[in-house]
Structures are given as C-alpha cells and as structure tokens.
Amino acid sequence: MVSQLVEAGFVNRYGPNQYGPGLPAALLYRRCDVARLLARIGKPVLKQLASETGLTSHLGVLENGMVTYKVRIPGKAPRAATFTREGMQLEAYCSGVGKVLLAGLSDEALEDYLDEGDFVPLTPRTLVAPSALRQNILNIRRTGIAIDDREVSEDMVC
C-alpha cells in the first residue's frame, strides 16, 4: 500500500524506512480544518459526559497561548456553566481547559509559554507567578485533573 502512495505522489521516500508526506498530501492537509474535525469527533463524547455529570462540557484548542472553545455542551445542573460559548477565547493559564492543554505540552513548549507570558490576575485567586503555574501544571500531569478554582471569575469553579 505504501508503494502505491509513493507512486501516486502522496508519500515521498527519503531513505530506507523513511517516508514523509508528498505534495498532494500536504495540500490536502492545508485544506483540512483539524479543529473542526476534532470537534465533530468529540461532540458525542462531550454530550455523554454532560448527560452523565449534569455539568457543562467543553472541547478547546490552544491557539497563541489562549484556549479557543470549539464545542460547548451545556449541562442540566442548576449551576451549569453559562459563562463560556463556542468560539470564545480565555487565557490558558487560569482556565480548566487551558490548564489541561498546557499540561499536554512538551517540557520545552511549556517553558517557552511560561517565559513569554505576561500573566494578569483576573481574580485574586489567579495564579500568575511562573513558578506557581509550573507547579500547578506538573501536578495536573501527575493527577490528570485540572481545576480553575475561581481564577477566571469569582463565582465559577471549573
């Protein structure tokens, strides 16, 4: 099958067992909206999560140090989040979704983010010191749980 892709130009062979995308594949990739595809795949999972927990569920992507919310499924709980909306951006360093995305960065990319950041407190509880943010992100990596404890808004825990 790989030989057919090489023959068609979709895959380039650079050496023994070394392959990369050919021009047609690269052009096709440029036309693909990865975030939209991810949202389409993730929506059923988020619906189930919101249904089972009663809480609002989100899917976001990291764009230039900000979280862009691509999917928002409202929960049925009385205090389900009403703050967010699809297409909205929030600072990654203080939002639950943003912290999850930051925890998924490589160590080098996380350090770059912390080095270039101008972290502004949105509430008195917002973590803004790079050392505190680093520790928080490392804890998220360890536990798999990210919490925004009134860091974006005084009346919102995420």
Where are these regions (language model features)?
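Generic alpha-helical structural context detector
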Residues: 3, 99-103, 138
